[in-house]
Curated annotation (Swiss-Prot):
It comes from Streptococcus pneumoniae (strain ATCC BAA-255 / R6). The keyword Transferase applies. ATP binds at A12, S13, G14, K15, S16, T17. InterPro entries: Depp_CoAkinase (IPR001977), P-loop_NTPase (IPR027417). Keywords: ATP-binding, Coenzyme A biosynthesis, Cytoplasm, Kinase, Nucleotide-binding, Transferase. It comes from the Bacteria. Catalyzes the phosphorylation of the 3'-hydroxyl group of dephosphocoenzyme A to form coenzyme A. The keyword ATP-binding applies. GO terms for biological process: coenzyme A biosynthetic process. This is Dephospho-CoA kinase. Residues 4-201 form the DPCK domain. It catalyses: 3'-dephospho-CoA + ATP = ADP + CoA + H(+).
Length: 201
């Protein structure tokens, strides 16, 4: 069984920067968001579940999901958010478990980028968990800029996940992304070489 490292963070904290860098270094890195996108394509397991629940109005003329509408339906209603988390969580976990088993056969070390790693209790899948951390104000600002959201909309999306401060206490390693990209990737280099960012383990 290969060594599996989980990568997590929050919306707009810089997870994908780390995941892309790891791929450039030759590592396999499963991106849970990309898996979700595949499952949400027409005919995918999540697509079918979402259309059955919300109805045809969430399908665009080209047959794809209307993601902005879907996000607003889910994020504006706590009940819908709860349903979405549960059903999507179950289907996604099954798909990720299959990918994990496949990679464990061939890879000495590989990574899985899972945004809700702690919230949905994936911790015991991993030998280590790396958290990409950024201060709350910077996170809100980056999210507003990236997705063209108002401050209230950005805050509402962040509220759907645990605060990064809470995740910080649970992670094996913390990658600080309050600086620039080079500083972030330098920390990844140190971990890949077996160094330790801190002495908590």
């Amino acid at each position: 069984m290969g060594k599996i490292i989980g990568i997590t963070g929050g919306i707009a904290s810089g997870k994908s920067t780390v995941t892309n860098f790891l791929r450039q270094q030759g590592f396999q890195a499963v991106d849970a968001d990309a898996v979700v996108h595949q499952l949400q394509k027409p005919g995918g397991r999540l697509f079918e579940a979402l259309v059955q629940h919300f109805g045809q109005e969430i399908i665009l003329e080209n047959g794809e999901l209307n993601r902005p509408l879907l996000a607003s339906l889910i994020f504006s209603n706590p009940e819908e958010q709860k349903w979405s988390n549960q059903i999507q969580g179950e289907i996604i976990r099954e798909e990720l478990a299959t990918l994990r088993e496949q990679l464990a056969q061939t890879e000495e070390i590989f990574f899985m980028d899972i945004p809700l790693l702690f919230e949905q209790d994936y911790s015991d899948w991993f030998a280590e968990t790396w958290l990409v951390y950024v201060d709350r104000d910077a996170q809100v600002e980056r999210l507003m800029k990236r997705d063209q959201l108002s401050k209230d909309e950005a805050e509402s999306r962040l509220a759907a996940q645990w605060p990064l401060e809470k995740k910080k206490d649970l992670a094996s390693q913390v990658l600080d992304n309050n600086g620039n990209q080079n500083q972030l990737l330098n920390q990844v280099h140190i971990l890949l070489e077996g160094g330790r960012q801190d002495d908590r383990d």
